[in-house]
Amino acid sequence: MSEPQRALPTPANDADLPDASRGAKRIGGHGRFRWAVVWTLIGTLIPGLGLWHAGRRVAGAVVMGLFAALVLAGVYLGTAGRDRVTTLGTNVGVLSGLSIGLLVLAVVWVAVIATSHLALRPLRASGAQRVTGGILVGALSLAIATPLAVGAEYTWSGAQLLGTVFADDPTDPGGTTSTDPTTAANPWGAKERINVLVIGGDSGTNRDASLGLRADAVMMASIDTRTGASTLFSLPRQTARIPFPQDSPLHKYYPNGFYDGVNGGNAEYFLNAMYNNIPSRIPKNLLGDHVKNVGAEVMKIGVGEALGLGKADYYVIINMDGFKSFINALGGITLNVNYRIPIGGKTTENVPPIGWIEPGRDKHLNGRLALWYARGRYHVKGSDYSRMERQRCVINAVVQQARPDVVLANFEKIAAAGAKTIQTDIPRNKLPAMIDLALKVKNTNLHSVVFQPGVAGWVSANPPWPAVQRRVQQALKEADKAEGGKTSTPSASAATSSSAKPTKSSSSKSEDLSDSCAYNPAK
């Protein structure tokens, strides 16, 4: 016969109950489902507090401690300053880790919401209460997990963009780096100016792949590292006799510049042929084993020497075919159209365009139309020269209209388009400094000089390089003076760059692009 069981002693109060039993008794004592709902909401906003209230003190304390640590980390980043944030935000490892961390946080947060509600819910909840609780937990989980998942996707896309586009070896990027001492406050040291070669390359779907990239547009952006004052120098693609410095190995092969020695009109020796032709005619490692893009390196040296600026610090190649996707990702750009611009067409073969971009003020163009705005030349006066003028207006529009809110709202599309559109040798460890410099540029007015007949005695077949270099130095002084706030430098009239025909003023002063890209329709 079994021994009779003894009755367990009744606890004097709730404090003598185990945590789980105490929480269940409390909720059951309230007998009201709405308090479980209220504390589920509170526990969602402050993860762990719902568990604590339900009697899961240890679990609640751990979750609240982790949440507090995340809040403190966010406060630190918010007060650490832009330099620290951009340094972390341009680190592939940090972005990849953050992406994974956000996904883990989403899973843990959702689990805490569900666990908290189950612990808070009355022991004898009705079927309706269980369904209502499930809907509540699902809605709260969706509200928390969605932004975290989007953030994870954005940071992952950013990491992929950085890893694809920018140089992965900061110790030997192929660019020109300053040897002057640098600090966080002055990342450029004593380097007063950064020169970036911008190449608009045509390697699109309609071009034979065997022909390689054609440098359809060539500009040098010279930027003052202190003020952000910037000047774009545009050279015609048919420019001949691009020189090389005597201390460059290229001078041995082209002592008189990139020239066949006979005909300055030989298209195989034009500026736009350098990218493909020179690498095929020189030893592969002539410029160093570290150089990954010989064509771009050749142009950095040659164009920098031609303008008297020295070798460009970095290059940026923009694939014109992918340019459409990039502009579409930005949501389009707004430009003034001062005369009819053809969409397609071939003047030499008398093939008419398939359409026109009609004149108008503040016309919002998608990627396709923006590309033709920059490239159209069928029976346009000045042809290549007018096209060069419009190309700098496109660059100015992108710089001025790519606002942070626009970039953030379209970040995934921009990152995907950028990875397919842009090549550069800017190293990742220089990105924080470049971002800071870009923000300075955004707060200034871009200036520009297009080398064309009427500017510095320009002749494409035989450019007067000493006069060109003097004009470059004059333009830099004008931009620095205008942006330095000492005096305002009068800019060329809007008609100067908006019309296809160059004017006298274009040869005497650099143009402020906010003026030269204004609406001033051709008569």
Annotate each PLM feature.
Residues 31, 54, 89-96, 131:
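Juxtamembrane loop-transmembrane helix junctions in multi-pass integral membrane proteins
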Residues 50-58, 109-132:
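Cytoplasmic membrane-interface segments at the C-terminal ends of transmembrane helices
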